[in-house]
Amino acid sequence: VTTADIAYAKKMGLAIKLLATSKKIGDQYSIMVSPKMIGMSHPLFAVNDVFNAIFVKGNMLGDSMFYGSGAGKLPTASAVAGDIVEAAKVNGNTGHFWTEEKLALADVSTVENKFFVRTTAAAEEVKAVFGDVTVMNDVVANEISFVTEKMTEAAYKECAAKLNGIVSMI
């Protein structure tokens, strides 16, 4: 994430947050940590500085957020690195601590997301590849940005391969 990405997000009324997300998709689970753009109306938008939050959508509970002071950047980075190493050790197989049932993880390339893209390509080229997207061109000179419709990461990569000049993607 660059200062230009942050400037684009601000211009769109969004904030870029590093989120750990999990979602059940059929009989599999999508689990990832990645930067996401969050709108001002979302409770996570206001989480800043040393504070962390967990936002939960439950079928009975509805939307709930748990908010508090975090551990700081170095302890948190160490914990994340430890979690990644542990996940690699179990080769993608995880289980609940209260059951022996294994959880099937969804292939990240099959999970749908919207993608924020910056490029030096012309708006016409972008629309020819990604469809009728809204293009923003007044933040960084000689560059445009857009947000895709929901698509899988595999579909995004296929489209991105057809477009020259991609500067960044979130």
List the model feature ranges, each with a label.
Residues 34-59, 70-74, 130-141, 148-150:
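Low-complexity, glycine/alanine/valine/leucine- and proline-rich hydrophobic stretches
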